[in-house]
Each structure stands twice: as structure tokens, then as C-alpha cells.
Design a protein with these regions (language model features):
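Non-catalytic, interaction-prone regions of core transcription and DNA-replication machinery
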Residues: 1-221
């Protein structure tokens, strides 16, 4: 039986306690005593792998661990694929920090099935009372900029382009991360469509179409 209430919000398991490691070398100090701890360590290992793949900050990883532990305590993780729960935890944590990660990028991992991720996302958000507010293309600019150059700009010309086209019906039902990536490509053209597509986990053809849409709408503004 899983003891959800015994979970601590730390990083490494030593002497039966999950502790945050200051030097992040938690693997060498772990002593796994039961199935509950095994599940937690598996989750953290998956989180580290996804974090490395996405070059995520330590602060964001810590925030995702907190979300995962909250989900674990609620019992919503029971019977669900651990990798999907971890990906959802990263998504929620990134939204809370103001730098949301595109869902399409999280589900690129071989460990994360998109259909199961979507179901898990709804379940975890319901269990943790997370607001399911829709995001706009501008919300994804910080993540895209960080992935492409490691920097963000308060005076982002891509944001100005997105503000100019507003909520045009041309983009209704379109992935906002794809629209954001297309705007970055258009205003800079320092990166290829393939590069910006990879950042948001979408196809080059999708970005090419969003670029075409943006050009068409911008010409009418």
C-alpha cells in the first residue's frame, strides 16, 4: 500500500527521507527502502532526463518536484504512467514561473504518450485545483527565446508582431506555441524554420503554414 502522506518535498532518499541535494548528486546517496520510495526516485530520474533534454533551470526542476509530490500525496498518480505525471508536473511548474513549456515539446519524449499525457494533465489539474486557463502565443516567447539564445528580451519584436495581429480568427484552434515560433522566425530570420519548429516540438510544415498565416494577417493590419 502506498503511503502518500509520508512524502517529503526534498530530493534524495537517505535513511528513509527524501531530501533535496545541494550538489544535486543525489543518486550516489540514495538508499531505497520500499516501493513508494522507488516510485519517487524513478519520477525524479525521469524529471532529470527531461530537464537535461530541455536544458531547464534547477529552480524549475525543484518546482516540478514539488508539483509531483503534491500529485503523489493526492493519490492521482496511482495507476498512471510516471513519465506522463512528471511531464505534467513540468508543464504546471513552467506555467507558474511564467515560462510555459509547449505540450508538444514535452510529449516528444519516447517515455511520454501524448494521449495518456492529455488524460493525466486533466486529472492532475483537477486533483490539485490548477487553473486550466488557455495560453496565448506571447506566453511561449520566453521559452522559445531561452531555447534559441539563452536570453529573453522585454522589448521583443515578436511580441509586438503578435500584439499587432491580435486575436485574429485565422489563428483560432491553432497551437499558440507554433504561432509564437513563427513570429520569432519572421521578425529575426536568424534561425531556420526547422530550428524554431524543433524548439516547440512541431513539424517544419506547421511552422511554414503559421509563417504564411502571420504574413497574410500582418499585411491587413
Amino acid at each position: 500500500m502506498v503511503d502518500h502522506d509520508s512524502v517529503s518535498l526534498d530530493w534524495e532518499i537517505a535513511d528513509g527521507v527524501l531530501r533535496r541535494s545541494n550538489n544535486r548528486e543525489w543518486r550516489s546517496a540514495c538508499h531505497i527502502h520500499n516501493a513508494t520510495e522507488k516510485r519517487l526516485m524513478q519520477a525524479i530520474e525521469i524529471l532529470e532526463t527531461l530537464g537535461d533534454d530541455l536544458d531547464l533551470s534547477n529552480d524549475l526542476r525543484d518546482a516540478a518536484v514539488d508539483v509531483y509530490c503534491d500529485a503523489f500525496r493526492s493519490g492521482v498518480t496511482d495507476g498512471r504512467v510516471t513519465a506522463c505525471v512528471v511531464a505534467v508536473a513540468l508543464c504546471i511548474a513552467s506555467r507558474r514561473t511564467g515560462h510555459p513549456i509547449p505540450m508538444s515539446r514535452l510529449t516528444q519524449s519516447e517515455q511520454v504518450d501524448e494521449t495518456k499525457y492529455n488524460r493525466c494533465y486533466i486529472a492532475v489539474c483537477d486533483a490539485l485545483d490548477v487553473d486550466l486557463q488557455l495560453l496565448s502565443p506571447s506566453d511561449y516567447l520566453a521559452f522559445i527565446r531561452g531555447q534559441l539564445s539563452g536570453e529573453t528580451d522585454d522589448q521583443d519584436p515578436a511580441a509586438e508582431l503578435l500584439d499587432a495581429v491580435g486575436e485574429d480568427t485565422q489563428f483560432v484552434g491553432k497551437d499558440p506555441a507554433g504561432v509564437a515560433a513563427a513570429s520569432v522566425y519572421l521578425v529575426e530570420q536568424e534561425h531556420t524554420q526547422k530550428e524554431v519548429a524543433e524548439v516547440v516540438g512541431l513539424s517544419t510544415e506547421t511552422i511554414r503554414q503559421r509563417v504564411s498565416d502571420l504574413r497574410e494577417v500582418a499585411d491587413d493590419v
